[in-house]
Amino acid sequence: LENNGDEYIAYDSRETDTDKLIERVKDADVVVLANQPFPAEVVEKCEKLKMISVAFTGVDHVAVDECKKRGICVCNAAGYSTNAVSELVFGLIISLYRKINEGKENMTSGVKMAPGIELSGKKFGIIGTGAIGLKTAEIAKTFGCEVYAYSRTEKHIDGIKYITLCDLMRTCDIISVHVPLNDSTKDLVSSMLIDEMKSDAILINTARGPIIDNAALAKALKDGKIAGAGIDVFDTEPPLAPDYPLLDAPNTVLMPHIGFSTKEALYKRAVITINNITSWKSGEPQNVV
C-alpha cells in the first residue's frame, strides 16, 4: 500500500463494539477486512467509503446490499483458500476414519483400538460445487471414491454425478459441505436431513457454521445415529462457549476455523486483496461481489 502511495491505518484485532468500529473506519476511502463483521449501521456512517476489499472468500459478514445501494464496491479474495480448505477436508476425514485423536490417547493406555476405515470405494457427497467443492471432488476421486454432488448450478464434469440433496444425505458415506452462507443456505442441512443420514456416515463442514443445524448434529452424534463429524466452522467464531453443543459430542474432530490458514493461502490472500485495491483504483475492479 505504501508503494502505491496510499496512507493506511492497521488494527490487529476485531472490534465487537459498533461505535468503536465506526470510529475506526468513518473517514476511510477503502476498508480492508477479513472476518470482521461489517453491518449496515456501520456502512451508513462511512460517508467517504468507496471500496471494501474483503480478505476472505465469503462475504456473509458484510452488508453487501447496503454497500450496493451506496455505490460502494465490494471485492473478495476469490480462490485464495481453495487448496487449503479442500486439503483440510481430507485431514478431518482421515482423522475420523483412522481414529487419530484416539490413537494418541491410546499410546499410554494400551487399550486396543478398533480397526479404521478406508476412503477407497466410499460414496462421497459434495454439497455445493464451486471452486472448493470441485477441488474436493478431484481429491476424492484420487482416493478412489464415487463422487456425488448437489448444487443449484450443475456442472458437466466426468466422475461427478448430480443427485438431489435428500438422496445425497440418504446414500453417501461421506458428506462435505461447500456452499456459501446466504438466506437460502442457512440451516440447509437441517435436523430432518441429518436424520436421513446412514448410521455409518460422517459429515464434514468447512464452509460456514449456520449452514448446518449444529444442535441437531450434536444430538445425532450423542444418540449414535451417525458415525462422526469433522467441523471447522461454527455459528459463532471460536472461542466457543463451554456449553456449545458440539464440544461434548462423541466422534468429532473440531478445529477453530483454520481451514483457510496455510502459509501459501495467506500469502495468496494478501496479494489478491492488494490487487483488488489497485485494480479498483485503475477503474477496472476485479473479484466484485
Placement of each model-derived feature along the sequence:
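Phosphate/diphosphate ligand-binding glycine-rich loop within oxidoreductases
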Residues: 29-104
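Short glycine-/small-residue-rich Rossmann-like dinucleotide-binding loops
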Residues: 36, 57, 151, 173, ...
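N-terminal glycine-/charge-rich "phosphate-binding" loop or analogous flexible N-terminal tail
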Residues: 1-28, 148
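Alpha-helix C-terminal capping/helix-to-coil transition sites in glycosyltransferase folds
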Residues: 26-27, 48, 170-171, 196-199, ...
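Rossmann-like dinucleotide/phosphate-binding beta-alpha-beta segment
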Residues: 114-199
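Rossmann-fold NAD(P) dinucleotide-binding segment
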Residues: 37-50, 63-66, 184-203, 214
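Phosphate-binding beta-alpha-beta segment of Rossmann-like dinucleotide-binding domains, i.e.
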Residues: 70-72, 77-123, 127, 135-138, ...
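Rossmann-like dinucleotide-binding domain for NAD(H)/NADP(H)
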Residues: 74, 200-289
